[in-house]
Amino acid sequence: MSKRNTMPDYDPVPSQRGGASKPPKKKKKKGSGLFGRIVRRFFLVLFTVIALILVAACLALNLIFNGPSPAARDVLTMSLLEPSGTKWIPGLFMDAETLDSIRTREDSNLTDEFSNTSEIVINKDAAISTGTDEWANSPDGIRFESHSGDTYNAHIMIVRDPSKVYLGTSTENFSTSIPGTRIDDQIETDGAIAGVNAGAFFDNGTSDPSVGSVPEGLVYSKGACKWTTGSPPNGIKGFAGFNKDNILVVAQDNLSKAQAEELNIRDGCCFGPVLIMNGEINQEAYNSNSGWNPRTAVGQRKDGAVVFVCIDGRQAGSMGGTYKDVIDIMIEYGVVNACNMDGGSSSIMVYRDTYGLFGEAGTVQVINSYSLLQERPRKMPTFWMVAP
């Protein structure tokens, strides 16, 4: 008996029996899946690295703020409190009482309330220390010099005639609905030949550098009182202004309008602390842990020449300067009265380059280097300006 073949017949063409053919499988492109995995892993690693850096930074900050060294804590606290973009950080690691005790520690040893105007005898033809004419190469009456320290680069602007220095304002009528202006725009509006940032200002309760709308504290401009409300932040007290005899008056406290009228103030604003008064150094400021920050200060020599100091913003080669650094520079340049102005991301010095000292003649040049995080100078309501 023969065995029956149970294997199915082979049909090489299934479609001929009415069955549907299966579509051929698409081949995956080599590398497409690999690229996706690489991208995902890259961002995963990047996110992990950023998270680890943030955690490490928080641990390091906590160690400094709450560690065994009060001096390191105070320096870091003051370095972070002054710039508007970082002043919120110390509050994350310290209670309000400790924070207040650090920032209000700088009580002055100076005994006078105001500087003595009789100390200044204006002599626009005097030299700083020798018989040579220091203005021989400065036909517009403005000299620039630079000074470097271990942690900072500073720019010094000396103005021969104090009567040309005035307080410029971003508007005739300050309002939180009117943003401030940038100093390079303000110098064009005023037709001035030089300028630096001036006093404290309010940013509508934000840290947005685009606002800079209204000042904090008394403001006088060209003989008129422009603002009387508020006071500088972080417990800062002080006033700097020129009277109608073109003498710089520095005060240890924020002036009232009545006091300013009595002192015949023509241009001035609130900020501090006073660094030098009547030739005497403010030792509390000099020896304080004021932190490394970009800084601006205004001072006057005995002959009436006005000295502005502007320390670069934070970047490679310049962490910033302390009050001590600024005082040392002012003393070196013969200043007898000086006051600290707003600093941090506000610190800036500009000059209409009349003779092409820094670039193309006639253009407005930014003399200092402000923060790397800023594309342009921030908006502000007040500026020290130099008229032509």
Task: Please provide the spans of the model-predicted regions.
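Solvent-exposed loop/turn segments at secondary-structure junctions
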Residues: 163-164, 200-204, 255-257, 304, ...
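Conserved, well-ordered active-site substructure
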Residues: 209-230, 282-337, 346-388
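Short glycine-rich loop/turn motifs
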Residues: 151-156, 236-237, 292-297, 381
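Zymogen propeptides
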Residues: 4-24, 31-232
